[in-house]
Amino acid sequence: MGLHESQDSTIYELIEFILDDLIQFINVTELGKEIFPIATFFDKNDIIRTLMEEKIDFYSRSVDNKVIVNFDEDIFRYLINLEEFDINAEDKNGNTLLHAAIDQGKSEVVKFLTSYKNLEVNTKDLGGNSPLHLAIKSNNPEIVEMLLSYENINVNEKDKYGDTTLHKAIRSYNHKIIEMLLLREEIDVNEKDNQGETPLHGAVKSNRPEIVKMLLSHKNMDTKQKEIFSFLEISREDEAKTPINDGVSILGASEAESYGESLHNKDASSYSL
């Protein structure tokens, strides 16, 4: 056994000794708040259960939410139901329980948390990501669906780069997630990021014609964008090489939009599409 393992074992034995033999002689509240972080560090759920059984006040906000969401279910539920427990509190890393559960892929924890009416579902972490942003980045349609069912969810929330949930969904290439977002009445399909690009730009840049068509068919798509990009898609798919086709092949999405707009303002009948 190495020195580090020996120290770990000694600390663990000391905690057990305190709980078994000295608990009646000390301030149990202060004890609990000291032991809880140590027990979580050593992943000793049995010690935490002893604190629970002895009805010792042990909860401490010093423990990261990513640790809390990985507790066994009985411990997690015990903590959540404590009067002093704030379900929306951020840890030192800026993560709420919801952020942490999504990051860890804990769909059952997300389901449990979204059953609370006071859950703040749009809180951003230090990176500017809402829980819905994280679920989309994680490519997890199950959790995305849970979040979308929550009453106050904001599907147009932006991160620090100006990306909406739809911008992120386009990058995920997950059709199911994109479809779920496009079905939302309040979704803004024309919102621009900090670079001035819409989700449609992203789909064109990524060469995802099937996603481009999904966006173009949306009832709220900006008419100007719809006309320009529909015009470009026709030229891109046409086997005959036309001036428009060549332009779309050579230029990037941003330049292609400008190129398409200039052509669109001319008499398109002069080109064989």
Curated annotation (Swiss-Prot):
Keywords assigned: ANK repeat, Repeat
Pfam family, one: Ank_2
UniProt cross-references to InterPro entries, sorted A to Z: Ankyrin_rpt (IPR002110), Ankyrin_rpt-contain_sf (IPR036770), Multifunctional_regulatory (IPR050745)
Claim: Repressor is one of the keywords in the record: no
Top-level taxonomic group: Bacteria
PANTHER family reported for this sequence: ANKYRIN REPEAT AND SOCS BOX PROTEIN 2 (PTHR24189:SF50), MYOTROPHIN (PTHR24189)
Protein name: Putative ankyrin repeat protein RBE_0317
Lineage of producing organism: Bacteria, Pseudomonadati, Pseudomonadota, Alphaproteobacteria, Rickettsiales
